[in-house]
Amino acid sequence: MKNRSYEYDVALSFAGENRAYVERVANSLKTKGVKVFYDLFEEANLWGKNLYEYLSEIYQNKARYTVLFVSSFYNKKLWTNHERVSMQARAFQESREYILPARFDDTEIPGILKTIGYINLENRTPEELAVLIENKLKKDQTFFKNRWSKLSTMISPKPFIFTIKVVDEKSQLVKHAKVVLVANNSTYLEGYTDENGLAHFVIRTRKLYTVLIAHSEYPAVVFKSMNPKEDIEVTIEKTNNSGSVIINKSGQIPGISGKIEPVLKSDKNLSVYADNIAIEGGKDQPYDFELNKSIVLEDNKGNIVHLTFRFYQARIALIDFYRGRSM
């Protein structure tokens, strides 16, 4: 089967525990003349390469389709999650199906909706699945023959994946940290670190970003003028009774009831409103504050929190907090 636009007709993404089944699929496809990316077919080619970058390119740009073999093992693997994120970056860009789920079980995969059509592998042999993949490719070849010239003018520039890894001072993974990328034009992307301490972002425009990281048990982190062309690893150190939070427009601070709303006034000064919260012993609101200078808040239950704003732009605030003693 000829493939004029892609290096591979299909790439296979799977957990190692399912290799026996997937290998039979790969061998069956190969005998049919399908150009299939299967890792054991590529051992010599993969030898010595930066696999993080190379596999991202394969699953994002070099295959016409990817078959994602869903199983309970898939979510637990670092490499399969990297492959999935690369696939999804491509899927976001295109209006047609690109990720083809094949399910060993009902495991939920982030970003793969249950409403997406899938193949149930429970009573299907690897050879039968290979026939389905071949039929899918044949239909797609006809579509691209008639439509490629039109589609090529509609597809936007290639997005790419930017990944931030967050660890603590003991090199332990930090899960559920909020990460926000604020562009120099004040647009932003936001996400959270996953079970592997990773936050992935699909970057579609070439801009510099300020990277904000917050977690309820760790202090705030700010990196300014960051070019997302290379992934980064960030180490944060836990401190007692303190943490950080990122709020958009308004939000709550852990350890105190009520909401706060920082604003940029017409005179370019920063101020904050607090709902049912006293600021600095009951000063008038909005209360003017400065970045990197602490202010004291107290709620109606006597809970006290010391706040330090580290960043404010586009209604997004990065805040360190320290829990004081209740009165």
From Swiss-Prot:
It catalyses: NADP(+) + H2O = ADP-D-ribose 2'-phosphate + nicotinamide + H(+); NAD(+) = 3'cADPR + nicotinamide + H(+). The record marks 218 as: Important for ADPR cyclization. It is an enzyme of class 3 (hydrolase). Gene3D superfamilies: Toll/interleukin-1 receptor homology (TIR) domain. Residues 10-120 are annotated as: TIR domain. GO terms for biological process: signal transduction. The TIR domain alone is active and produces cADPR. The active site is at residue 229. It comes from the Bacteria. One of its GO terms (molecular function) is hydrolase activity. SMART domains: TIR. InterPro entries: TIR_dom, Toll_tir_struct_dom_sf. The keyword Cell inner membrane does not apply. Its EC number is 3.2.2.-. The keyword Ligase does not apply. Keywords: Hydrolase, NAD. This is 3' cyclic ADP-D-ribose synthase AaTIR. Transmembrane segments: none annotated. Homodimer. It comes from Aquimarina amphilecti. NAD(+) hydrolase (NADase) that generates 3'cADPR, a cyclization variant of cyclic ADP-D-ribose (also called v2-cADPR). Also cleaves NADP(+), but does not cyclize the product.
